[in-house]
Amino acid sequence: MAAMGRTARTLGLTLAGLVGGLLTVSYLLQRRPSGVAMGLSPSAFGLALAGYFWLVNRDRSILKGASLTAISWATFWLASIIAGGEMMGLNRTSSADAVAFFAGGVVGSLVMSTATFSLYANAQPTLWRLLVCTIGGGLLGVAGQQLGYLSMPHAGPNPTPALFIVWQTGMGFLIGRFWPTIEAREPTRLSIVEPREKSENPNPR
């Protein structure tokens, strides 16, 4: 049952990430995109994740949903600034682009996975789970942009639609796959916080 629940959650969050990615680039498909659409597109990933928890987990907290959406908006611009800063400090080569988008992906994945786990998970994530999500997000940033170059070879250093779709879909998968759970085992040094105390009624013999 636990494995089935994890699989369903992973699939659901992956689809939510895909929806978020499509919403992020949807304004590019409009002939005359409105300022509202362009302004809200950075928050699409957080909005899609919050929508998943609203519909599937029945977590109807408006505060949580609004917080995740706002964090998504801020993270979008933070990752963009960091990636742009890396490009300005490096020579214009394909390897420099990879470093820049890896850095942006790392920052975005660290913030979004930490925020999602903190708001919606019933257990605190261990450092190794956050580390996997963070490194995975960096690799997704590189892979997404490289795929974008194949379809848009003249895109240059500009983010491509493929970047957002690949990154958000992949992050949805990673968040679902490495969702923190309460495990019945002794605490390790990789735990962010100490596990909950044992039951008050341990039933000693």
Spell out what each predicted region is:
Residues 188-205:
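Short, basic, low-complexity termini and linkers enriched in Ser/Thr/Gly/Pro
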